A protein has these predicted regions:
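Flexible "arm" and connector segments at domain edges
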Residues: 3-199
């Protein structure tokens, strides 16, 4: 019979500790929503915000397609403005890009794209949520996204392309979908508070 040495005990303890850590990690992963679930959660949060806004503004119908387009183009303009230090060659004294402000402007574009999806599309959003490549590796500037957005339409392929374009803008500036999701939740709370006040 093999003798149990101090080394055996130490190795066993190490393995036991590692196994415990792995079990903890697996449990954490099991409780973590998938990206598709996060996307559906964003749609739900946006739907609730839209209802608040529509009640407050006494709107009987959602905004028109053109109104959505104007709002999204305006938010892309604000996102691009946050990047002025990168493209404003005629002015020497530009503030450096503020990553937090940039993220908030990107989230604002997400708000209107989600709202459009809730109010102006006629397909299964679960299917859309499961079709989006959240680990999309392409990178897009706001202008490149705008070019994609010009094909913005009711169909699922176009909406999939729109959201993957937004993920691509996030990639360009170092924002993962997870980070966008967390920032979206925070901004959504602010938007709900505004909708309940006199904003």
């Amino acid at each position: 019979m093999a003798q149990i040495t101090f080394l055996h005990i130490k190795t066993y303890e190490k393995k036991k500790k590692r196994l415990k850590a792995l079990k903890k990690e697996i449990k954490k992963m099991a409780n973590k929503p998938t990206n598709a679930e996060k996307f559906m959660n964003m749609l739900q949060m946006q739907f609730e915000t839209d209802l608040l806004v529509m009640r407050k503004m006494q709107m009987l119908v959602p905004p028109s397609v053109d109104e959505y387009k104007f709002a999204i183009i305006d938010e892309i303009g604000e996102l691009n403005h946050e990047l002025k230090a990168k493209w404003c060659w005629w002015k020497e004294s530009q503030e450096p890009v503020n990553q937090e402000n940039l993220l908030m402007e990107l989230v604002d574009v997400w708000h209107f794209c989600l709202s459009f999806t809730n109010n102006r599309t006629n397909f299964d959003v679960n299917e859309l949520a499961n079709s989006i490549a959240y680990d999309h590796l392409e990178e897009y500037t706001p202008i490149e996204f705008l070019n994609k957005f010009n094909r913005f339409a009711y169909g699922m392929p176009q909406m999939k392309e729109t959201f993957e374009g937004l993920i691509g803008v996030g990639n360009k500036f170092g924002f993962t979908f997870d980070r966008v999701y967390e920032a979206y939740k925070k901004k959504n709370e602010e938007n709900n508070a505004r909708a309940k006040s006199n904003y």
